Amino acid sequence: MSALPSPSPRPARSQYEDFLRHVRDHGVVKADRTGTGTTSVFGHQMRFDLREGFPLVTTKKVHLKSIVLELLWFLRGDGNATWLQERGVTIWDEWAAPDGDLGPVYGVQWRSWPTPDGGHVDQIAEVVKQLKTNPDSRRIIVSAWNVADLPKMALMPCHAFFQFYVAPGDSPSARGRLSCQLYQRSADIFLGVPFNIASYALLTHMLAQQCDLEVGDFVWTGGDCHIYSNHREQVELQLSRAPRPYPTLQIKRRPPSIFDYAYEDFEIIGYDPHPAIKAPVAV
């Protein structure tokens, strides 16, 4: 088993809530593709030290099952929502065709980026290879933004590009400390961003385990960061609540590869969120 070390008591962190408040107070009113309307700022960054806890938002309950299964679905290289639907996850249903097809979305690009000669690049396998053999590389990058495939996608990638970085580790037994930075070109702060933070933090933990690394930071960088107009009441409710300490993540086993994890391999310990807050998805 591998457990995330954390100080006791764990501190309550408010980067996400501070970000939400900043956009509410300083954003500009903008139109958007969905016709819903937003309050938006351009450019924001948050840094989460994964040694201090697992960054799962506490000012509302976040549906962890959907986060974990969606990440495993991405790692399968899947472009059809059926696998998720069979496991009770409906977060992609609004964009899926009747047969579940979504086109060459995230997982397809991660695992099967097409090359001009008719081949494919498995970007995730390449990340694992580089982390194990060349951890100082500045090219440990995954992109979901395949310009040629964008018209075929049911939804163009919002979280589009991420990079890994290995620093010296704190423990003599570790090969280094793994950090990840995500660039998210479009960020639905109330509904989407809590999922995205947790998803990439989880991926960082998984890769660290597979590559004998400690976890470092997860850095979230956003482009168009927005609150939808029909989320304003929900945002006010969330911002009226005090953040609580982050939980910790325990990975119960080390599977043979990054592609062999199961939902049951993960346990979140000490998650004590405020109640969930429902809001409509802008399609």
UniProtKB/Swiss-Prot annotation:
EC number: 2.1.1.45
Main localization (coarse): cytoplasm
Subunit structure of this chain's protein: Homodimer.
Pathway: Pyrimidine metabolism; dTTP biosynthesis
Its biological purpose: Catalyzes the reductive methylation of 2'-deoxyuridine-5'-monophosphate (dUMP) to 2'-deoxythymidine-5'-monophosphate (dTMP) while utilizing 5,10-methylenetetrahydrofolate (mTHF) as the methyl donor and reductant in the reaction, yielding dihydrofolate (DHF) as a by-product. This enzymatic reaction provides an intracellular de novo source of dTMP, an essential precursor for DNA biosynthesis.
Name of the gene encoding the protein in the UniProt record: thyA
Residues at the active site: 158
Listed transmembrane segments: none
Record's protein name: Thymidylate synthase
Cross-referenced InterPro entries: Thymidate_synth/dCMP_Mease, Thymidate_synth/dCMP_Mease_dom, Thymidate_synth/dCMP_Mease_sf, Thymidylate_synthase, Thymidylate_synthase_AS
Top EC class of this enzyme: transferase
Molecular-function annotations in GO: thymidylate synthase activity
HAMAP family, per the entry: Thymidy_synth_bact
Binding site for dUMP: 33, 138-139, 185-188, 196, 226-228
Catalytic reaction(s) noted: dUMP + (6R)-5,10-methylene-5,6,7,8-tetrahydrofolate = 7,8-dihydrofolate + dTMP
